């Protein structure tokens, strides 16, 4: 019995030690698919000797995990949903981190003057369109555009379909099936060489994609939240914001830092 108690005690100490050196970061599939996390996280892990456990989900699912206390930090991209999360007391603090933009891609470049004209054209001609359909930041952005231009997606015909998948899978499906879809530029650039799609519409101002970081309220879990504070402060630091600006794909800067 003494041996069993000793083993149990040592195991408890070991697991507690591992927990103190781990951070659970729940983030978006777009940041995961784009390769950005593989670029930026090693800097944090090396500086603080903390292992970051990444869980990639659509923003809606990421926020749900935060509400359950199954995350230390959230790194997402739908401001309205994030503020609902914060106002409900699930988050302790939030800040903007960086932005890029979305694109409409598909089998042909539509060359229209605005995102509204692009969505009008897709609707009027019933061009086959894949929606993420997963309550992700990208999905919510797409829905907000349809609503902004006076459309109700629940009335759309079979030309409009939901994939229920992440950004990478949805892009692959759009390429294979000659559908249009909305994507973030970083995931598109990461997968560009494997896709047979054209940029149908692109405009930084009209399709802005803002990313924010939130520290989950520590009352929702029983983990030490020191690492969450470390990461939150670190991602907003001037030198790390420079690192963010230096991440490039397609010979383009992928993210523009705007920490508050």
What are these language model-derived features?
Residues 1-4:
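Bacterial N-terminal signal peptides that target proteins for export
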Residues 6-14:
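Bacterial N-terminal signal peptides
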Residues 18-47, 60, 64, 79, ...:
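Exported/periplasmic ABC-transporter solute-binding proteins
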Residues 20, 49, 68-69, 80, ...:
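Extracytoplasmic
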Residues 52:
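Non-catalytic beta-sheet/beta-sandwich ligand-binding modules that flank or precede catalytic cores
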Residues 63-78, 82-96:
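Short beta-strand-centered segments that line the small-molecule binding cleft or hinge
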């Amino acid at each position: 019995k003494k041996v069993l108690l000793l083993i149990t005690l040592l195991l408890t100490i070991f697991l507690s030690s591992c927990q103190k050196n781990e951070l659970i970061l729940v983030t978006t599939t777009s940041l995961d698919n784009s390769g950005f996390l593989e670029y930026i996280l090693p800097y944090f892990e090396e500086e603080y000797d903390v292992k970051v456990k990444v869980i990639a989900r659509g923003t809606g699912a990421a926020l749900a995990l935060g509400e359950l206390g199954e995350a230390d930090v959230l790194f997402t991209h739908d401001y309205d949903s994030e503020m609902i999360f914060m106002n409900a007391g699930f988050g302790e603090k939030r800040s903007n981190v960086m932005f890029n933009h979305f694109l409409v891609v598909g089998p042909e470049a539509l060359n229209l003057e605005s995102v509204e004209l692009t969505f009008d054209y897709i609707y009027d001609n019933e061009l086959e369109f894949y929606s993420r359909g997963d309550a992700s930041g990208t999905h919510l952005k797409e829905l907000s555009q349809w609503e902004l231009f006076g459309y109700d997606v629940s009335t759309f015909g079979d030309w409009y379909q939901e994939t229920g998948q992440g950004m990478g899978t949805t892009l692959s499906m759009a390429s294979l099936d000659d559908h249009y879809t909305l994507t973030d530029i970083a995931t598109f650039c990461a997968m560009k060489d494997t896709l047979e799609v054209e940029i149908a519409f692109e405009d930084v101002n009209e399709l802005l994609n803002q990313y924010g970081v939130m520290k989950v309220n520590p009352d929702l879990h029983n983990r030490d939240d020191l690492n969450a504070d470390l990461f939150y402060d670190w991602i907003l630091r001037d030198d790390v914001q420079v690192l963010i600006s230096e991440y490039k794909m397609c010979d383009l800067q992928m993210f523009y830092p705007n920490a508050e």
